[in-house]
């Protein structure tokens, strides 16, 4: 019994140590709004996340008449000195970010699963990872952002049945475009908006320390890249058509000029004697 208890404590201690192997590298980012977070276990990177995020949080204030309530909104970003924690597993991972003396706690939960490819359901299964839950715990008694909040206290805003940033296993998700999530708050079911952009995330299967695997671009970025590339391709095709047209026209002119300069032979054979 004592051995089992010791073994259990050892496993728990190892888990705690693994959770503490985290680094906030946001100071290395060239974008002041973009954060860089790394979770490591046994000296190896197991989760990397780079993104810029902004929260739009509604809260109540008392109207001037002292009776009615007015809903205000505050915009919150993650500061450079935020504290982080994390967990890595074969099929579930987690990133926790807190700041302002624990007034804000942002949790991102990742999971890995197998999905059938194709609409007919006959294609082989492929492994993917996704964000399956996002949660923000915030305290409206924090008066830097929540000015004159009515009945201040802690609230929890969460997603329900989320399946976001679905990415093939072994690859990192990349998206410069903004991704918006709506969390439902315990504060009278208010909607908290989470806007994430300039993203690169990989919560599983990182092969090299501090290095993302092959990127998987979001549909929005692919569309924008196509929109940027398409005019260039069309311009090249149009230019090629113009060059071909001019070349054919120039060849036609030279051919006509050569034909005009040839001597005209008389059709009456009797005239050959005088030639």
From Swiss-Prot:
GO biological process, one term: establishment of protein localization to organelle
Domain of life where this protein originates: Eukaryota
Entry keywords, A to Z: Cell membrane, Cell projection, Cytoplasmic vesicle, Endosome, Glycoprotein, Membrane, Signal, Synapse, Transmembrane, Transmembrane helix
Ranges in the topological domain labelled Cytoplasmic: 250-275
The keyword Nucleotide-binding is annotated on this UniProt entry: no
Membrane topology note: Single-pass type I membrane protein
Positions of glycan attachment: 24, 42
Residues in compartment: Extracellular: 19-228
TM segment ranges: 229-249
Subcellular location field: Cytoplasmic vesicle membrane; Cell membrane; Cell projection, Dendrite; Cytoplasmic vesicle, Secretory vesicle, Synaptic vesicle membrane
Gene Ontology, cellular component aspect: cytoplasmic vesicle membrane; dendrite membrane; early endosome membrane; endoplasmic reticulum-Golgi intermediate compartment membrane; endosome membrane; growth cone membrane; late endosome membrane; lysosomal membrane
UniProt key word Transmembrane helix: yes
Signal peptide: 1-18
Post-translational modification: Glycosylated.
Recorded family membership: Belongs to the LAMP family.
PANTHER family found in the cross-reference section: LYSOSOME-ASSOCIATED MEMBRANE GLYCOPROTEIN (PTHR11506), LYSOSOME-ASSOCIATED MEMBRANE GLYCOPROTEIN 5 (PTHR11506:SF35)
Job of this protein: Plays a role in short-term synaptic plasticity in a subset of GABAergic neurons in the brain.
UniProt protein name: Lysosome-associated membrane glycoprotein 5
Source organism per UniProt: Danio rerio (Zebrafish)
Lineage summary: Eukaryota, Metazoa, Chordata, Craniata, Vertebrata
